Every structure is written in C-alpha cells, then in structure tokens.
C-alpha cells in the first residue's frame, strides 16, 4: 500500500480545517468524500510506527507491506498549503530525510512518488492544483531517494508523461554509476497499448539504457497485461482528468448538480470540450486511422438498471 505517493501512515493529518486524506484521495482514487471522512475519523495513529502496529488488531488475509507516500510526507512536514506552493527549506528537507530514515528502519518498502498529470486535489481553493509530490524538485527527490538507496529499498513511481526528456532525467536516479549505488525503481502506469503501439519499445529501450553497464541502474516498468476496467459514476473518473474541460467539471462538488449543468451548457466550455475530445481523432495520425476503421478506442460497459 502507499502507491502513487498517497497513503495513511501519518494518520488523518487534519489541521486547521485541512483534510489531506480527502483532498488527495478523492479525485486520484475516485473515492467519495463522505467515505474518506469516515476513514479519517477511524484513524487512531499519527506516525509510521503506530500505523504498522494497528495492523496487528486486524483480521488480515493478504500480507501487508507499505511505501512511505511522498505527498503525505510533504504535507506532514510542510503543511498542505506550503507543500503545493513552495520548495522545502533545508530544515524541512532534513526532517523529511529523518522521517524516511525511521520508516526504512521499521521495514517500509521504500518511497512512492507520482508524475501523472491528471492527479488533482479535490477541496477548495486547491482544485486546480496537483498532489504535493508533483511540486518536488530533482534535488529533493535525489536527497530523499539517497535514504532509500542506502537501505536497498524501492522507489515506486509513475512516469512524467508530459515531458519525456524530464522523465528520462528523473529516471537516471536509478543509476549506480551516477549516484554510487543502484536504486531499485518500479515505474507503473495503465496504458492502452493500441493507442500507443510503439510505447513498449520506448519503455524497453529506456530500461535497457539505464540498466546497462554504462549506467548500472535497476529500472523496471510495470503494465497490466489485461483490460483495465474502471468503474465510475458518469463523468467522475480519474481518466477524464486528462482533459482540462472535464477536469474543471470533476472539480465541482459531487452533488453540485446545478453547477455541473451550468458548466455543460456554457458555449465556451462546450467548444473547449469538443476541441479536446476531437484532438487526435480527426487528422491523419494513428488514432484517426484506427477510428475510421472501426477499431475500438475504448470499451464502455453499462450495467443494466435493476
């Protein structure tokens, strides 16, 4: 647990009206706010050690192992507002390193970060802001991952798909040649391979380069080998966060029916949505070729009303 930089090893982290669990999990994991608030209220721990201890009182089926979630680590040290508005100062960086060091000694798997561009916060006034891990610099990650590297643990992340060169630069953190010791790195993402048929070659090429004798890395890409089925209620789905128009729609409160109707009947919004939706489907690229020949762009299964 603790993937995509999100987790609960610091408890609810509620301070001064802030709800980090609700703010971070709602839109990324598609969980209703009322459910998350009940979960936060039930948390009796506020540190990584007590989080592990609480499992002793649960009737568990599978084994549980946890990453330290980077977004929650930033919030724990800097506070929610600061974690999405500025870089940490030296004392804050040292505090994050100290907490991470303690977690590694407790047996945590490593550090989890996130680079997907459609992971947004859900509470006002931050609905246009992404989760805290995405505001971290290369320097911050290098310092935190040096702790993970020292303990021979794992860096779990999702690729920075907006900028391939930046993603490649960040993935060099796996290199033992550049940073003294190889860092086990797991990069995970769900993709439609039919929409990007050459992506597997790109991933394998990057891994081959970084894991070569020249750079001595330990990078492994993970992808689901089957259909990725997502259940959602209408437009409310993390997958629709990719478009700025639908992200604006999802940012409204779930039960704000009137607000959604106003937005969907706004001519400017309608035009923007149509432009974004048709992008890549009306030209001479692969997506357009696929659509013209009737190949599925995506599969929507509607549950019959009971």
Task: Give each language-model segment a name.
Residues 1-2, 7, 18-25, 51-157, ...:
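Catalytic pocket of metal/acid-base enzymes, prominently hydrolases
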Residues 13-52, 71-72, 81-95, 104, ...:
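Polyanionic/metal-chelating signatures
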Residues 128, 138, 166-182:
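Short, electropositive alpha-helical surface patch
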